[in-house]
Amino acid sequence: MDETGNLTVSSATCHDTIDDFRNQVYSTLYSMISVVGFFGNGFVLYVLIKTYHKKSAFQVYMINLAVADLLCVCTLPLRVVYYVHKGIWLFGDFLCRLSTYALYVNLYCSIFFMTAMSFFRCIAIVFPVQNINLVTQKKARFVCVGIWIFVILTSSPFLMAKPQKDEKNNTKCFEPPQDNQTKNHVLVLHYVSLFVGFIIPFVIIIVCYTMIILTLLKKSMKKNLSSHKKAIGMIMVVTAAFLVSFMPYHIQRTIHLHFLHNETKPCDSVLRMQKSVVITLSLAASNCCFDPLLYFFSGGNFRKRLSTFRKHSLSSVTYVPRKKASLPEKGEEICKV
C-alpha cells in the first residue's frame, strides 16, 4: 500500500533517517517516470485515436492501458513537489488521497489489462478456431469496462483514508499507518490485492505463455511469422513488467507490513526497510514506462498505424489547396478508409 511509502523509525535508540535518500530518489525517479510515461503513452494514445478506423481487440486494450498510465503520471508531479519540499504536502487532503488512489488504480489496471491481453493472445494462437468468436472488439470493450469498475471500487478505501498531520499540523502524505486497527485493515487489503491483483494474474500469464511457446514450437516459424513475433514481443515485455515492477513491490510490501507489527525494530533493519520501500515503490510506478514498449513490440498493427499516421501527417504538411473538381490527396484517402 502506498501508505507504506515512508517508514517512521520507531526505535528510541535510532536517530538516523533516510530522508535525504528518500527525497532525492523519489523526486528524481518520479520526474523521469512522469516525462517518459506522459510522452510515451500520450504519443501512443494519439496515434491510436488518429487511426481508430482500424479497429481491433488489441487496440482496445492498448488504449485503456495508455489512459490508465496517463491518469497516473499526471499525479506523479504532485509527489515530486512533496519530496522536493522534504515531505511537506501543499495540495490539500483530497489530492493527497487522490494521488495514492491513482497509483493503485494504474498498478492493478495495468496488471489486469496485461493479463487479459495475454489470455486472448493465447486463445488466438492455441485455439485459432475459437478465436473468431472469442477475441472480438466488443468482448474486449466489455472486459475493459469490467476491469475499470472492479479496480475503481476495490481501490476506493484510499479515497476515504483519514489525513495525517505532523507536530506542526502539516499534512503528511504516503505515510505508513500508525495505529494497530489501521495496520490490520491495511494488512487485509494487502492480502486481497496480493492474491487477486498479482498472484492469480501471474499464474494465468505463466500458463498462457507456456501454452503459446509450446504451440509456436510445434508450428513452422515460416508460417504466420508476424503473429509469432507479436506473441514473443508480448511475452518479453509483460514478463519484464511483472518481474521488474510488480513482483519486487508485492514481495517487499508483504515483508514491510509484517515488519510494522513488530514491537522492537533494530535501527539497521528499519533503515534497510525504508530504502527497500523507496526502491520497490519506484519500480512499481515505472510500469507506466513498460506499456509503450508493449504497444510497439507486440503490436505489429501499431507499427502499421504509425506508418499510416506518418503518411497522413506528411500529406497534411505538403497539402496544397486545389479546385473542388480535383481528386483528394493520397494521404486524405488513407485517413478516410
UniProtKB/Swiss-Prot annotation:
Record field: transmembrane: 29-49, 58-78, 107-127, 142-162, 194-214, 231-251, 277-297
Disulfide bonds: 96-173
GO biological process: calcium ion transport; cell surface receptor signaling pathway; chemotaxis; defense response; establishment of localization in cell; inflammatory response to antigenic stimulus; neuropeptide signaling pathway; positive regulation of cytosolic calcium ion concentration
Glycan attachment points: 6, 169, 180, 262
Any one GO cellular component localisation term in the record: membrane
Described purpose of this protein according to its UniProt entry: Receptor for cysteinyl leukotrienes mediating bronchoconstriction of individuals with and without asthma. Stimulation by LTD4 results in the contraction and proliferation of smooth muscle, edema, eosinophil migration and damage to the mucus layer in the lung. This response is mediated via a G-protein that activates a phosphatidylinositol-calcium second messenger system. The rank order of affinities for the leukotrienes is LTD4 >> LTE4 = LTC4 >> LTB4.
Name listed for the protein in its UniProt record: Cysteinyl leukotriene receptor 1
